[in-house]
């Protein structure tokens, strides 16, 4: 089954055409600067990279251009659009409506629209992509795969905040969690690599990138995760503060004479390791500054980041009554051996020994703990697009 996987941002559109049977990526690309001057589509297929400069006034234009590229006689990979069996859409927020991926109907689209206030930066773009695809490919089944759905198995005592209960009933203020598709994929893949049933494992998945979150996955289900009502809660991140004392917001409003919105903007875009280091949100830059130039604030930023990850791993081991597997994934998790070692140092009491030679791995599946470790520590590159394609395939197959 050929599945087109679409991930729409406010001015961008990432896509992959995947053969779902074997996960083979037939083509992939990125449409940038949608609705802005100098729009560009970068299309990768058959080992070639094609750049197409053409104005895209909206997501519909972008999807038309993507489809044109896919069927192009020179650099396309399919003869015509009828070869696309289904479209899988990444949707950031499904609120409490969705516990799994779903076939997109008018009712589903309305529910996604109702979640806009929970994800004002992301859901509108996701909706644009869905509507555009429906207009261009009205007869092709479409599936929504939610970042939040995997975490809908959290128990109420894990997802409720200790604030007046009426705010939950009135406004649905609760922990939702994000990166669910990634946490689901790497936990399942880790179990496959170990050749053990996921239903028997306690897994801690660490998705560490510019946005970072950790999940406690017990018997294949998410029982807790570090991001919350929004992706601002939890770990220190590239530019996001993660969890802080809520009183800091009103304190900064008063001291700096700024609005709540301005403070939240600072916490989202000017904080995290960027805020502490004053240098960059890119961990490669921070490692260079800290280890090559001896920059104290860059070192401090890395310490704060690693400490919060370490603390969360420990707390999730407690929440699950132990741990069998710790998995690192995403940009930093997959490609940062030094950061991984830094995080794991002091956690040996959980039952693992790090193999420093194996830990040198970057961007590949590997078990990086020693053979005699009771707990397996692993690197598993995430593959959210493949997970979206597999979910889409499963739902479309069930319609037959």
From Swiss-Prot:
In this chain, Mg(2+) is annotated as bound at 7, 384
A GO biological process this protein is involved in?
acetate metabolic process
Q: Which Gene3D superfamilies match?
A: 3.30.420.40
Q: Which GO terms describe its cellular component?
A: cytoplasm
Q: Does the keyword Metal-binding feature in the UniProt annotation? A: yes
Site residues by UniProt (Transition state stabilizer): 179, 240
Associated pathway: Metabolic intermediate biosynthesis; acetyl-CoA biosynthesis; acetyl-CoA from acetate: step 1/2
Q: How is the cofactor bound?
A: Mg(2+). Can also accept Mn(2+).
Q: Which UniProt keywords apply?
A: ATP-binding, Cytoplasm, Kinase, Magnesium, Metal-binding, Nucleotide-binding, Transferase
Q: Where is the active site?
A: 147
One Gene Ontology molecular-function label: acetate kinase activity
Q: Where in the cell is it found?
A: Cytoplasm
Q: Which Enzyme Commission number(s) are listed?
A: 2.7.2.1
User: What cofactor requirement does the entry state?
Assistant: Mg(2+); Mn(2+)
- Indicate which residues the UniProt annotation says bind ATP: 14, 207-211, 282-284, 331-335
Q: How does it assemble?
A: Homodimer.
State the similarity comment.
Belongs to the acetokinase family.
State what protein this is by name. Acetate kinase
